[in-house]
Amino acid sequence: MNKRKYVIFILLCMTTWLQAQDSVKTFDEFFVTGMKKIEGVFPVYVAEKEVYLEIPREYIGREIEVRGQIDRGFDLLNRPVTGLGVVRIMSPDKATICFQKPFYTERILDEKSVYQRSFSLSNIQPAGDSYPVVAYSKEQGAIIRITKYLINGNDWFSYNHGFIRSLVPELSEVTKIHPFEGGVSFTVRRYHGVEAERYMFSSSAIILPEGSIPLEVTCVVHLLPQKKDQIRLADHRIPYQTLTFKDYSQDPYCMVEDSLILRWDMSKPLTFYVDTLFPKEYFQVVKEGILVWNTAFRKAGIRDALQVKYADSKIIPAEQRAFVSYDLMMPGIKSDFTWHPRTGEILSCRVNIGHGFQKGKLDDYLLSCGASDPRIIADRYAKEVEKELLQNEITGEIGHLLGLRGNLSKNSCGTTVKVGEDACRAIYFGYNPLKGSRNCYDEREQLRRWIDKNLPDGTHSLPPSDYAAKVSNLQIILNQLDKIVYKGGKRDKGSSLTDIYRKAIRQYGSYLMGIAETVGSSQPADAQHQAMLELDNYLFHPVEKMECTYVKENLLEARNNILYPELVKMFKHLLSIETISALRLQALHSNQKGYSDDDFFRDLYKGLFDDFDPSAAVSYEQMDIQLICLDAWLDIIQENAKHNSTTKRLKDELHSLYNRLEKLSTIHPQAEVRDMYTLLMGRIK
């Protein structure tokens, strides 16, 4: 019986296979009257509304990248979308083409490893998405139908914006097919539903039947060049964005978790094309913000690595490796890039500047740099300052697009960003064309020796705190904030002032947190002690309260409603298990020369609780802060009961605090202080 079932199964498989073979037409049957062929790397056939793509026989086994972008529509210009990515073209049988997406989480990077063959046999890759072959060309290229993937599918490219509603596929059409040196691009006009009220007063919207408007999208199929994988392994000391994988060739007994960096192939210059619709007043600052990175590339041995050009009418944005655009819909500066999942090579990138990009940036600059830059005091919207901020933002985004992690570029108030030594070292590590390396492991060892020689001592330490100066500068601005906002005497109901006032108080809170983060860090003991003194000077006992008199007198905003949540975060950091554990560890490892937990509590009591001096006057705000500190302390003990050693240290110190408060609750001359300390004691119980 089982033998009979087996025979039936084989017959069914054969029947299915034969039917698949029969579905493949001859080229003469396929190439109907009126069909048009567009020659190129990937020939394209068009008949009425159907679009077919030919995969030449020699490209089977090659890799392609399928990506897309929104060209225009919904007030968007050249915005990247999620693409299919890098796939390998496979042909498992005569009737099928597959786009395989191998997984690279497990690898053997050593091409000469004796385990290569066994690894490849055991590490079977998925077949990927399959596409029926419609016909074969006279050159034996496989022809597949791709209409639905362009018109209404989400497989090759997709986008998700709340203001773009459902697709109306029956109205969508392919409007342009453009072969280029590396592949072919398809421009599609899709129609989406729209919330009519949103566009009632928008000159950019044309309301079409059934409430839909067009969205122009381009999908690019790019044949990736055949070349040796240019992998550069990461080192934790140099901040790059990375891909993590498990390597079986570094240790004969187990896998080793490793990572490689994301970077461009700089064998030819990377040209950033700027959209022709980009405002000319900003072109130069964007150009300078990009080209400033050439300083780092020159030190890495690469000249004219980055270039900037205006895109002319012949340039199709979606086909370019790097493109910069300006549109109206989404304020702010955003960047995105695609990369090869095996090699980490960055393949394309986009920089999008949305109208209103300066929103918030000028206010941030006023609060942080206004005390030293009179231009922003004279005019909150100074064009010169706006351009400098844009250039700085672009420089930071380009660093991200080059594969770097974090912002390594440096600037000070009133200046544009310069590429510092940290950034130059990072570019050298990622892009210097090393010679004489046998493989990626040898290359990394060579770079590690270079790092050991060139990375200065103390790189891992936090820089000296300048938050004290920042708090002082913020105080200067806050004192005159109403005069700056209402320059010329024109005043509203307070909304303009209230918005920036809230931001100022939150910034004050962030500065206090920055000071607090020094405690428990790798900074020297003197720096950590100084941080506690600064908290005393700028929070516990400030000479001048961080306040705007106009806001307070006109009851526009309650300062403490904004500040106190920030203080909760600060105390939860200072009293966290991580911070206290780090302080205890410092005391053990430094022969009592480090900043210990005893030192921390001594400084905390001296500042916040006046060293328990009964003659010291205590303000209502100081009592509020004491209560916030105690509540954070109790929360941490409750949330971390499992951390026995450090939690016990916190509990013991809390009992010590209780005994001191108990004494003050009976002898302090201020009745309200006695009442408060009685309340605190009740909470501790």
State each model region's role.
Residues L11-Q19:
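Hydrophobic h-region of N-terminal signal peptides that target proteins for export
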Residues N411-K685:
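Conserved catalytic/binding loops enriched for acidic/polar residues
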Residues V24-K25, Y310-I333, E388-K435:
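The catalytic-center signature of Zn2+-dependent metalloproteases
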Residues K3-I10:
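Sec-dependent signal peptide recognition
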Residues D22-F278, A296, A311-K361, Y365-E386, ...:
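Auxiliary tRNA-acceptor-end handling modules of aminoacyl-tRNA synthetases
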Residues P279-V286, I290, K383-Q391, Y501:
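Solvent-exposed, acidic/flexible segments
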Residues I60-G61, P279-A305:
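Zn2+-dependent metallopeptidase catalytic core
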Residues Q284-L291, T295, N392, G396, ...:
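Solvent-exposed, polar/charged alpha-helical surfaces in well-ordered, non-transmembrane soluble domains
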